[in-house]
Amino acid sequence: MMTNLFSVFDPSTTILNLSLNWLSTFLGLLLIPFSFWLLPNRFQVVWNNILLTLHKEFKTLLGPSGHNGSTLMFISLFSLIMFNNFLGLFPYIFTSTSHLTLTLALAFPLWLSFMLYGWINHTQHMFAHLVPQGTPPVLMPFMVCIETISNVIRPGTLAVRLTANMIAGHLLLTLLGNTGPMTTNYIILSLILTTQIALLVLESAVAIIQSYVFAVLSTLYSSEVN
């Protein structure tokens, strides 16, 4: 059991040992065309309300300096991460957001583009961010080092936070799932099943929260460079 504990995170398949499991990341693209020829249902109404709420919140975070349509990128980022987080909760579907390969590929280009835009177009504003307001002159060099380090590690913290939360929950679900078939006591089996259902509900909440945190922090990082 323990030797196969991390097998759920293996992107390789039995077909020529290729990493075809990454294709599950793009399953969400199959659902997009349905909105063009199906009548609006309750799910679409709820989803549109969620997107509208996110648009208003991200618009507030970006402030008056945000460009028109700038929230579309962060709403799309939220949708992509949340969809892949939920896909990983289904049996036999690969969780792409549990790999730093994907999370870093999302976080690093965003952070790098924000930094390049800020340092090229608002150089003085970016220098001012390195020294918090009210810092004593003696501590200014020290604060510049701290702010620089905290700025550089931002894409890493974004990626690791999402990956660690996905891995932790899936490991617990895998451990309970492997323990169940070896249990002959029906009372213990019912307790394991109840715990697994509760964990599944908790992981569903984590899937939403982590995608929201990723999108909100990305929005805040972009608002700092304007």
From Swiss-Prot:
A molecular function (GO) term: proton-transporting ATP synthase activity, rotational mechanism
Which InterPro entries does this chain map to? ATP_synth_F0_asu (IPR000568), ATP_synth_F0_asu_AS (IPR023011), ATP_synth_F0_asu_bact/mt (IPR045083), F0_ATP_A_sf (IPR035908)
**Record's Gene Ontology CC terms?**
mitochondrial inner membrane; proton-transporting ATP synthase complex
Which regions span the lipid bilayer? 20-40, 74-94, 100-120, 158-180, 197-217
Major location, coarse class?
Answer: mitochondrion
Q: How does it sit in the membrane?
A: Multi-pass membrane protein
Question: What is an example of a Pfam family matching this protein?
Answer: ATP-synt_A
- Residue runs in coiled coils: none
Arranged from A to Z, the UniProt key words for this protein are: ATP synthesis, CF(0), Hydrogen ion transport, Ion transport, Membrane, Mitochondrion, Mitochondrion inner membrane, Transmembrane, Transmembrane helix, Transport
Q: Where in the cell is it found?
A: Mitochondrion inner membrane
UniProt keyword DNA-binding present:
no
Q: What is the annotated role of this protein in its UniProt record?
A: Mitochondrial membrane ATP synthase (F(1)F(0) ATP synthase or Complex V) produces ATP from ADP in the presence of a proton gradient across the membrane which is generated by electron transport complexes of the respiratory chain. F-type ATPases consist of two structural domains, F(1) - containing the extramembraneous catalytic core and F(0) - containing the membrane proton channel, linked together by a central stalk and a peripheral stalk. During catalysis, ATP synthesis in the catalytic domain of F(1) is coupled via a rotary mechanism of the central stalk subunits to proton translocation.
Subunit notes for this chain? F-type ATPases have 2 components, CF(1) - the catalytic core - and CF(0) - the membrane proton channel. CF(1) has five subunits: alpha(3), beta(3), gamma(1), delta(1), epsilon(1). CF(0) has three main subunits: a, b and c.
Entry-linked NCBIfam families = ATP_synt_6_or_A (TIGR01131)
| Recorded family membership | Belongs to the ATPase A chain family.
Name of the molecule in the record:
ATP synthase subunit a
Species whose genome carries this gene: Anopheles quadrimaculatus (Common malaria mosquito)
Taxonomic lineage is: Eukaryota, Metazoa, Ecdysozoa, Arthropoda, Hexapoda
